[in-house]
């Protein structure tokens, strides 16, 4: 089986015999049931391939679709003029870059249709005349496809406020052509990571239909579990043989590491296509999607966010709280969700609330490592420390874990842990410990878990051990351990067969590390 790793052109995939997960029935629905659409999906999730498929369809390339679902649906196969804007791979951080890109594309099309302008005109008006000319020449409405419509904004987000405003104004004027040129248009499809509420393409009449959370199109990009098990049964079997395990074990590993995305209340399981194809191609389960690059705009945004990531994850939200992004508001939830680092995990119909959390282990470990590295700025390599810490907890070696934690915290610069008041200092140590433990994603880590007798600071559950931690800042480890006993935090685990450890920890705000540690079995 040939995997289209790094190939996003529908023509190449079909002509060169690469495996293709057939989404063409949904392509037909889009083409016949609407006119102007917007779809938000994370990077490397198949948006470019979708637009390439739409282009081939609207250009009437019937031979490419032989044997696919759409072959039995479409009868006419009319050819339309397709205008494809692909902003992928273009650097918009320089002033004037967006102007040059648009001018280059429009100039080429103006030459094609013999359009001559004596005076400089706005981009929207120039494109309007091009669309008119195309429709008149072909006798059919033109098709416009825009890949990563928001990249000129994301490239300068939290970096160049003035350039962000200029690029936004240019795009507002340019995308407004879809309203003016309605009679010359057959179909418009825009993709992007996020939905900027200030861009006029999402306001007024003829606005795009946002299908990002439509049940019907939830699986438009990505791979469903059914598609994985039916179309990739052979490579899963080969992977199991290579690893010396069962096919069920491979399916479970793939699910834990790459599944978990849900884009609507329909809750269809969607696997990350980039990671799945890479894993099956190499027969190795690795962090392919995350290591392919973390968006710089997200890192910059998180630098301005003063709450912990634990304040955002595993919580219920109204749709408006995570769908529309406003660039002038320092609230990263919509960007984190739409970038693919959080996803829908549950939906309560009565209250219209959505539970958001990490989709899978690849995203959770990668995102938390990024946040921890950025937040702590520790001199010790985080990945190396994490692997050894996991090994210690797995074997019940609490003393070794204590030494490692003490050493790690001592390596954090004083400037990072300097806080003005006691609640902030205590919050810093709690959050630091939370990040480190959540990184050990093979375990269940519950931070500040509510119980009938109070709130437990931290519980770590492994297959063989349960660790109950209580923290104090500038207090004593004995007081922390006494609180575990007096509050009965271990009571829910009385019938648990695993070995239980109660650990009282005292942090010193002066040294920035562990000062006291008491453990009881």
Where are these regions (language model features)?
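Phosphate-binding site recognition
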Residues: 1-425, 440-441
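A short beta-strand motif that forms part of the nucleic acid-binding face
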Residues: 43, 195, 462, 472-475, ...
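Active-site metal-binding core of divalent-cation-utilizing nuclease and nuclease-like domains
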Residues: 133-138, 439-463
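Structural motif
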Residues: 143, 465-467, 501
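Mg2+/Mn2+-dependent nuclease catalytic core
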Residues: 165-170, 473-490
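Metal-dependent nuclease catalytic cores in nucleic-acid-processing enzymes
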Residues: 174-181, 334-342, 431-439, 483-503
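Conserved catalytic cores of phosphodiester-cleaving nucleases, focusing on short active-site segments
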Residues: 433, 456-473, 487
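Domain-level recognition of nuclease-like catalytic cores that cleave nucleotide substrates
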Residues: 492, 496-521
């Amino acid at each position: 089986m040939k995997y289209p790793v790094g190939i996003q052109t529908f023509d190449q995939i079909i002509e060169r015999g690469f495996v293709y997960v057939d989404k063409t029935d949904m392509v037909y629905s889009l083409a016949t049931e609407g006119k102007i659409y917007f779809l938000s999906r994370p990077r490397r999730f198949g948006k470019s391939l979708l637009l390439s498929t739409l282009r081939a369809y609207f250009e009437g390339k019937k031979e490419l679709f032989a044997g696919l679902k759409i072959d039995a649906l479409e009868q006419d196969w009319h050819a339309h003029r397709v205008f494809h804007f692909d902003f992928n791979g273009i650097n918009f951080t320089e002033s004037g870059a967006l102007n040059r890109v648009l001018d280059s594309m429009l100039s080429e099309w103006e030459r094609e249709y013999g359009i001559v302008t004596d005076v400089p005109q706005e981009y929207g008006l120039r494109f309007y005349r091009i669309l008119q000319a195309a429709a008149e020449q072909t006798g059919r409405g033109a098709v416009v496809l825009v890949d990563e419509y928001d990249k000129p904004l994301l490239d300068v987000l939290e970096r160049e406020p003035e350039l962000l405003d200029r690029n936004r104004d240019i795009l507002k004027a340019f995308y407004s052509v879809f309203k003016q040129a309605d009679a010359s248009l057959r179909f418009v499809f825009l993709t992007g990571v996020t939905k900027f509420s200030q861009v006029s393409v999402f306001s007024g009449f003829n606005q795009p239909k946002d299908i990002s959370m439509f049940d019907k199109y939830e699986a438009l990009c990505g791979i469903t579990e059914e598609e994985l098990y039916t179309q990739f049964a052979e490579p899963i079997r080969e992977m199991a043989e290579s690893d010396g395990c069962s096919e069920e074990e491979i399916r479970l590993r793939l699910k834990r590491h790459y599944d978990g995305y849900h884009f609507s209340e329909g809750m269809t399981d969607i696997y990350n296509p980039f990671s799945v194809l890479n894993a099956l191609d190499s027969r190795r389960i690795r962090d392919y999607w995350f290591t392919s690059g973390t968006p710089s705009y997200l890192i910059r945004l998180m630098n301005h966010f003063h709450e912990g990531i634990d304040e955002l994850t595993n919580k219920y939200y109204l749709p408006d709280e995570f769908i529309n992004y406003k660039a002038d508001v320092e609230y990263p939830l919509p960007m984190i969700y739409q970038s693919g680092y959080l996803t829908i995990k549950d939906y309560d119909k009565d209250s219209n609330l959505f539970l958001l959390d990490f989709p899978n282990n690849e995203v959770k470990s990668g995102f938390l490592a990024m946040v921890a590295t950025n937040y702590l700025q520790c001199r010790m390599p985080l990945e190396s420390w994490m692997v050894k810490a996991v090994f210690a907890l797995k074997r019940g070696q609490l003393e070794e874990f204590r030494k490692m934690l003490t050493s790690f915290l001592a390596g954090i610069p004083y400037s990072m842990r300097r806080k003005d008041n006691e609640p902030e200092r205590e919050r810093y140590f709690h959050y630091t410990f939370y990040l480190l433990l959540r990184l050990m994603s093979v375990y269940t880590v519950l931070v500040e878990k509510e119980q009938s007798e109070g709130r437990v600071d931290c519980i770590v559950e492994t297959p063989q051990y349960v660790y109950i931690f209580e923290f104090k800042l500038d207090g004593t480890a004995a007081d922390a351990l006494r609180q575990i006993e007096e509050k009965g935090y271990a009571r829910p685990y009385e019938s648990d067969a695993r070995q239980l450890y109660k650990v009282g920890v005292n942090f010193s705000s002066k040294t920035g590390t562990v000062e006291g540690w008491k453990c009881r079995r």
